[in-house]
């Protein structure tokens, strides 16, 4: 196939048009010629999106109608960079959970218990995003709760039944669908016991919340009002069985690496023991050695940890991983901003050293991947403010100096590029 791109001048009779959307060669970046038809770059991208969606829906399923672990991890790889071990653990756990539900109707002497999941990793390493992506792959209702807002029933704050209410809302009040959903509880490290010593003051937002979560995580019939909380006691309650709801808990657990290291030091005493200074090891490397007893020392009660038998630890993201996150996934930040600029018919490009500088700044802020968007917003703010009123801008280039704040983005105008083409010709 030959590639046809025309200049803005010339006879309109010679202007070529896309056979699919009808746009002229001047309205698109590229026009590709076939034997009798033309297709523009925008239609090619649209076709690719349709094919990707169809591939996702025609995902290979196991005999139980549940996506296989290999298929789950394949889709996760498209959206989440790195964290291979965590993705492997999650794909197996989710596959087994929904396989268990597929066989629940069949009579068996062996009752398969539910395996809820605990995700442990630094801030911004992808815990929440992994849980959201899993729910999309399996196509089940998903809701997220912040553990810091939860309190025991009867106290000011959100009670745990509100989590089930949110899931029901995500399922459009379809109780059957809600009972097969996924609940992600974030910041569970913030509900650790405040102290090992008993106190006359009740710990309603720490151990009290852990106790309240035990029942719904293990499986109970929760009475949920359709329209929110404890404020309308006269309303008819909906009965939601939480037995088959998959609970995924996540937290950064700041300081947990020190507890693990201290335990490791006790076990590595003696001749021939390899000793590495704690400061030589990254947080993610230390977290790989996590045991349930470490979470007990951190402040989670043993009964709560017992309801979360699958432990997955995530690595802290280094510079290279953050650069990949910026540019490689399907909905990478760079691609998102490029799409925004395309709406103004402007091409946005980043130098490699600019992406590296953005990654460095996120590491300094200690916000992981979560901090990348705020950095990008700051860099592109003035450009996005000016662009709608500027005429003739064809391309915007972001260099390392722009990220550092020592230079402005480079604007390339279509008139200039045409003049250069005419001169060289």
Swiss-Prot record:
InterPro entries given in the database record: AAA+_ATPase (IPR003593), ATP-dep_Clp_protease_ClpX (IPR050052), ATPase_AAA_core (IPR003959), Clp_ATPase_C (IPR019489), Clp_protease_ATP-bd_su_ClpX (IPR004487), ClpX_bact (IPR046425), P-loop_NTPase (IPR027417), Znf_CppX_C4 (IPR010603)
Domain ClpX-type ZB: 6-59
SMART domains noted in UniProt: AAA, ClpB_D2-small, zf-C4_ClpX
Pfam families: AAA_2 (PF07724), ClpB_D2-small (PF10431), zf-C4_ClpX (PF06689)
Taxonomic classification: Bacteria, Pseudomonadati, Pseudomonadota, Alphaproteobacteria, Hyphomicrobiales
Role of this protein: ATP-dependent specificity component of the Clp protease. It directs the protease to specific substrates. Can perform chaperone functions in the absence of ClpP.
GO molecular function, one term: ATP hydrolysis activity
GO process terms (BP): cell division; proteolysis involved in protein catabolic process
Full protein name: ATP-dependent Clp protease ATP-binding subunit ClpX
Binding site residues for Zn(2+): 18, 21, 40, 43
Source organism: Sinorhizobium medicae (strain WSM419)
UniProt-listed Gene3D superfamilies: 1.10.8.60, ClpX chaperone, C4-type zinc finger domain (6.20.220.10), P-loop containing nucleotide triphosphate hydrolases (3.40.50.300)
Oligomer status and interactors: Component of the ClpX-ClpP complex. Forms a hexameric ring that, in the presence of ATP, binds to fourteen ClpP subunits assembled into a disk-like structure with a central cavity, resembling the structure of eukaryotic proteasomes.
């Amino acid at each position: 196939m030959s590639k046809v791109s025309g200049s803005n001048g010339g006879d309109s009779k010679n202007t070529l048009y896309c056979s699919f959307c009808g746009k002229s060669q001047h309205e698109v970046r590229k026009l590709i010629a076939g034997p009798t038809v033309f297709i523009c770059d925008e239609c090619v991208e649209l076709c690719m999106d349709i094919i990707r969606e169809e591939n996702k829906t025609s995902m290979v399923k196991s005999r139980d109608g549940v996506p296989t672990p290999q298929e789950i991890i394949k889709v996760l790889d498209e959206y989440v960079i790195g964290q291979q071990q965590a993705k492997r653990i999650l794909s197996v756990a989710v596959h087994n959970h929904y396989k268990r539900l597929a066989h629940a109707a069949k009579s068996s002497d062996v009752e398969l218990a539910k395996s809820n999941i605990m995700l442990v990793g630094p801030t911004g390493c992808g815990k929440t995003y992994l849980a959201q992506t899993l729910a999309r792959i399996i196509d089940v209702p998903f809701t997220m709760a912040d553990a810091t807002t939860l309190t025991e029933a009867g106290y000011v704050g959100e009670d745990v039944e509100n989590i089930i209410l949110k899931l029901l809302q995500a399922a459009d009040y379809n109780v059957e669908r809600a009972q097969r959903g996924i609940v992600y509880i974030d910041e569970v490290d913030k509900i650790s016991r405040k102290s090992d010593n008993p106190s006359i003051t009740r710990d309603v937002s720490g151990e009290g919340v852990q106790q309240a979560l035990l029942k719904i995580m293990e499986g109970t019939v929760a009475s949920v009002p359709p329209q929110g909380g404890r404020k309308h006691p006269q309303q008819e309650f909906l009965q939601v069985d939480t037995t088959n709801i998959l609970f995924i808990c996540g937290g950064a657990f700041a300081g947990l690496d020190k507890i693990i290291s201290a335990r490791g030091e006790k076990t590595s005493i003696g001749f021939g023991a390899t000793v590495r200074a704690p400061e030589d090891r990254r947080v993610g490397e230390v977290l790989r050695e996590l045991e349930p007893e470490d979470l007990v020392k951190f402040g989670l009660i043993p009964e709560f940890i017992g309801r979360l038998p699958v432990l997955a630890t995530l690595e802290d993201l280094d510079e290279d991983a953050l650069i990949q996150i910026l540019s490689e996934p399907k909905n990478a930040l760079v691609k998102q901003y490029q799409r925004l600029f395309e709406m103004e018919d402007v091409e946005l490009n980043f130098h490699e050293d600019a992406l590296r500088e953005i990654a460095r700044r996120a590491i300094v802020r200690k916000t992981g991947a979560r901090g990348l968007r705020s950095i990008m917003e700051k860099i592109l703010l003035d450009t996005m403010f000016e662009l709608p009123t500027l005429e003739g801008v064809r391309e915007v280039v972001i260099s390392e100096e722009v990220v550092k704040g020592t230079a402005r983005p480079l604007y390339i105008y279509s008139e200039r590029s045409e003049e250069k083409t005419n001169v060289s010709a």
